[in-house]
Structures are given as C-alpha cells and as structure tokens.
Amino acid sequence: MTESTSRRPAYARLLDRAVRILAVRDHSEQELRRKLAAPIMGKNGPEEIDATAEDYERVIAWCHEHGYLDDSRFVARFIASRSRKGYGPARIRQELNQKGISREATEKAMRECDIDWCALARDQATRKYDEPLPTVFSEKVKIQRFLLYRGYLMEDIQDIWRNFAD
C-alpha cells in the first residue's frame, strides 16, 4: 500500500472500490457488500480496509443515490443475459436467489420480461440434438434431462413435443 492511499479515509477508499466494481458490470447490493468486505490484494498479500459498518452503509447509499446500484435494473439485465445464454427460468431464479435478490423482485421481473420460454427450450434442444427432434422415448428422455439441467420447466419441455405433433 502506498503512503498516499494509507492516508485516505476508509470511506473514500471504499467508495473508489465500489465505483470500480460497478463500472465493470451491474451487481446486486448483496454482491457489492460481499466484494467490498473482501480484503484487497496488495503487494504484501491481502490488506484489510479499516472501515466501519457506517462507512459501508454510506457507500451503498451513495451508490443507490447516484444510480450506480439498482437491484431491479440488475435483475432485468441478468435475466436477459442468462436467457440469451440458453438458461431457463428455474435456473435463473436459483442464481438470483444466490445473489441475494428477493423472491418477490425475481418473480416481478420474470413476469415483466418478454421471453417465450417454450420457444427458447425448443431452440436449445434443436441446437444440441438437431432438427427434427427425436420421437423415440429414450432420446426424448435425454433431451428432457438436458433441458431440466439448463433450468427449463417440465411443462415447457413437454410443450415442445405437443406443438411438434400439431
């Protein structure tokens, strides 16, 4: 740690660190708190910031006030990002829960997002197993397991074959 950074107050160092973290991508409040509390890797190994709980609260409040930290924006972007990567609603909900997002906020964002999960599940299945999708039971089970692992709901998976039969 340099001499100039050691003289800076803990609040200023925390705020600088928070802005750097949030400049890369959106984070949930819980993620930011966890990252701010983690020790900083310095030249001589991990270094603690001697900050009080009040300093952490002030930094979080400042980030909220200035629009750097917004859980609803984070949730909407996270859902869009993970759905583009081919993950289903169950997996996305579970990941958001791990990131400290409330169930109510997650459900609200899932209702507001305009994603056709059945079409997305079909797209993932055809990417992995080619078109047309197999109708043999053993092959259908493989596809179902794959889609369940990716986080799709069983009703969306079954709709693939119902719509395919039409």
Swiss-Prot record:
<dbReference type="InterPro" id="IPR053925">
    <property type="entry name" value="RecX_HTH_3rd"/>
</dbReference>
<dbReference type="GO" id="GO:0005737">
    <property type="term" value="C:cytoplasm"/>
</dbReference>
<comment type="function">
    <text>Modulates RecA activity.</text>
</comment>
<dbReference type="Pfam" id="PF02631">
    <property type="entry name" value="RecX_HTH2"/>
</dbReference>
<dbReference type="InterPro" id="IPR003783">
    <property type="entry name" value="Regulatory_RecX"/>
</dbReference>
<dbReference type="InterPro" id="IPR036388">
    <property type="entry name" value="WH-like_DNA-bd_sf"/>
</dbReference>
<keyword id="KW-0963">Cytoplasm</keyword>
<dbReference type="GO" id="GO:0006282">
    <property type="term" value="P:regulation of DNA repair"/>
</dbReference>
<dbReference type="InterPro" id="IPR053924">
    <property type="entry name" value="RecX_HTH_2nd"/>
</dbReference>
<protein>
    <recommendedName>
        <fullName>Regulatory protein RecX</fullName>
    </recommendedName>
</protein>
<dbReference type="Pfam" id="PF21982">
    <property type="entry name" value="RecX_HTH1"/>
</dbReference>
<dbReference type="InterPro" id="IPR053926">
    <property type="entry name" value="RecX_HTH_1st"/>
</dbReference>
<dbReference type="Pfam" id="PF21981">
    <property type="entry name" value="RecX_HTH3"/>
</dbReference>
<comment type="similarity">
    <text>Belongs to the RecX family.</text>
</comment>
